[in-house]
From Swiss-Prot:
Pfam short name (any one): EMG1
GO molecular function (one): rRNA binding
Binding site for S-adenosyl-L-methionine: G174, G179, L196, G197, E198, E199, S200, L201
Enzyme category, top tier: transferase
Assigned keywords, A-Z: Methyltransferase, Ribosome biogenesis, RNA-binding, rRNA processing, rRNA-binding, S-adenosyl-L-methionine, Transferase
Family membership: Belongs to the class IV-like SAM-binding methyltransferase superfamily. RNA methyltransferase NEP1 family.
Positions of the record's site feature: Interaction with substrate rRNA: R59, R100, K103, N107
Its job: Methyltransferase involved in ribosomal biogenesis. Specifically catalyzes the N1-methylation of the pseudouridine corresponding to position 914 in M.jannaschii 16S rRNA.
Originating species: Pyrobaculum aerophilum (strain ATCC 51768 / DSM 7523 / JCM 9630 / CIP 104966 / NBRC 100827 / IM2)
InterPro entries attached to this UniProt entry: Alpha/beta_knot_MTases (IPR029028), Rbsml_bgen_MeTrfase_EMG1/NEP1 (IPR005304), Ribosome_NEP1_arc (IPR023503), tRNA_m1G_MTases_N (IPR029026)
Protein's UniProt name: Ribosomal RNA small subunit methyltransferase Nep1
Superkingdom of origin: Archaea
Self-association state and partner proteins as the record states: Homodimer.
Length: 221
């Protein structure tokens, strides 16, 4: 399975709120410049009121939860899974199956901030994460141009019947907290659109279920 977490709410603090007291206080506490820290609704909520599309931004915790679920799975440990994080600003993070994401959230934030600063982590040796500019369409085309997506509008199907398909697919899941894909074509052009029910689920919940189905199909469970 190749996971693409699309339009993720992961970005550095944008310039227009660098001078907001909430941002300055957080940056000062951490010994960094405002433009070097991740935008985080839990810390920067007062400042984010000034941002466009604020409801879909500032949620690095979504990426953290998804990577914890995916990177520590049997699928990834057996080399049968690879994750890509696409951000709303068209950055892509390629995550090695060998990367063990910090379980502590603050350590994860520090790691991603280092990644934005250096382009790869660790800075020396074989990178476990790499960051580069790339839009979602280009990424999906490079991954074969065929993908499945989880979306409320999709066909409901038992997980037991999805597993073998998910195991060999590029699987797209939204990495944003509210709303729908801004790139509508992600759903419209998908080879398969899956639904896990009428109720919207957190991205990490979707990933857990999809990974489990693929692991069963691969004989890992």
């Amino acid at each position: 399975m190749i996971l693409v977490l699309a339009e993720s709410a992961l970005e550095l603090v944008p310039k227009e709120i660098w001078n907001h007291p909430a941002v300055l206080a957080d940056a000062r506490r951490r010994g960094k410049r405002p433009g070097e820290i991740l935008l985080d609704r839990a810390r920067h909520h007062p400042a984010m009121r000034l941002l466009a599309d604020a409801k879909r931004r500032g949620r690095p915790d979504i990426v953290h939860q998804v990577l914890l679920a995916f990177q520590y799975s049997l699928l990834a440990k057996r080399g049968l899974g690879k994750a890509y994080i696409h951000t709303r600003d068209d950055y892509v993070i390629a995550v090695s199956p060998e990367a063990r994401v910090p379980k502590n959230y603050n350590n994860f934030v520090a790691l991603i901030e280092q990644l934005f600063a250096l382009g790869k982590v660790p800075p020396k040796g074989e990178p476990l994460m790499e960051l580069y500019r790339k839009d979602l369409a280009t990424l999906l085309q490079e991954l074969g141009g065929v993908w499945a997506v989880f979306h409320e509008s999709g066909a409901r199907k038992p997980l037991s019947q999805m597993g073998s398909e998910l195991l060999k697919s590029v699987v797209v899941v939204g990495g944003f907290p509210h709303g729908d894909f801004q790139n509508k074509w992600v759903v419209e052009k998908a080879a398969v659109v899956y639904s896990l029910g009428e109720e919207s689920l957190d991205a990490a919940q979707v990933i857990c279920k999809a990974v489990t189905a693929a692991e069963v199909a691969a004989g890992l469970l």
